[in-house]
Amino acid sequence: MARTGLQRHRGKLLGTGAVLGGLVVAGVVAAVAAKRWVRRQQQRLSEQHYVREQIKRRFTQTQQDALYTMYELVPVLALVLGKELDVEELVETLKGKKLKRAGEDDEQGSGGHASAGEGSVSSTVARSKAELWQELKMRSAVKLLAVVYTTCMLLLLTRLQLNILARREYLETAIRVAKGEEATRRDAAGWLGAVWEYGAAALGALGPRPAVTAVEPVDQHEETRYVNEQAFLSLSWWLLNRGWLQFKPLIERQVEQQFGTLSPRDTLSMEQFSARLSNTIHAVNRELFDSDSRALLLRALLPDATEELHVLQQTLDEGSLRVIERDDSMLRELLQETCRCAESTASLIVLESLVNESFQFVMQQLETKVTKKLRKPATDAPEADGAADAPSQKFQVALYSVALKDCCQEMLKNGLVSMNNEYLQDLDAVPELDDLSASVYSNFGV
């Protein structure tokens, strides 16, 4: 009876079993497909997270490299400014004249009356000493502002250069990796097509092969890229050696307007000196960063076409120069982008922010150094007239001049080993500088 029932409903049972089996298989396939889809999504999110972290790490490392580069360039700037605006020699000369005058006073005290001729020599010495103090007053202020503006421009230029190069390197690496992954996928999925292509080629079914375009050897391409990048980075030589001279007359003119009428014996409070220095900086900013005179800023930052070859000859060897003569297309692209960035409003805002930070640093250092010099005998300044002890706390202009000299030394301190140049650290921490660097680094549309 049961066998008869099974035989009678065998078709239905088989059909039902097939349907159930199909549903189970479909469910398993759907589950596997869903699992694979989830795995792919997780992998994609993981890759995106990795890429973002990689970009952040590269960006952070690039900014650190820029700071290290500044530590390497500051000693060069110190040598250049020390030669062009030598205030140490003036101070040593003044010290020598003070010792000489003290010796003459001792001789007059022990040897009786001095002759008329000796009095004439003494007046000459006194007059030349006054002239030296006047020169120290002007030169120390000019050097201070030259240090401020050159260092700020050098930091901006270094950030622009390294971030542009880092972005290009990242894009080239990403494209190379993407091509490699695409080739791997083609090799894994197209083995049957490869067999067919091989057979078709053997039968002549593919027709003539397309002509192969000559490609530059990899080694030569890498050499050209490397030399162009080095040439691009070496252009900071211009700012260090020639570029800062473009705005030096502007600084001298503004310093003369604010400090020219002051005598080294005149006294100013810290607030009064700060106001004069601030007025000088604002006047320089108006002419240097004004939208109508950005040509002066560009001439200071980068050499023009007539000076570019001279700069490269100073920084590259003969082999590298031959590579540049053969192909400088990458250098041209890098320079064009740097000029666009330097001319932008964002760069001007960054420069003004760096100069303002420099002013704050200078005033802090100045107050500390002036106060410290009052605690010990002023061996290298004119005799104090008691104004420094007054309640108004006014100090001689001569004392400010010597303090400015010391401030320049602090700002140009060689901290390459210990990385302890406080001035560079303060500039490197300016938020606007990081904002501009991030904008340049992430500008993948260039």
Curated annotation (Swiss-Prot):
It is a single-pass membrane protein. Residues 101-122 are annotated as: Disordered. Residues 34-446 are cytoplasmic. InterPro entries: Peroxin-3. It comes from the Eukaryota. One of its GO terms (cellular component) is peroxisomal membrane. Residues 1-12 are peroxisomal. Its main location: membrane. It is found in: Peroxisome membrane. GO terms for molecular function: protein-macromolecule adaptor activity. The chain crosses the membrane at residues 13-33. This is Peroxisomal biogenesis factor 3. It comes from Eremothecium gossypii (strain ATCC 10895 / CBS 109.51 / FGSC 9923 / NRRL Y-1056). The lineage of its organism: Eukaryota, Fungi, Dikarya, Ascomycota, Saccharomycotina.
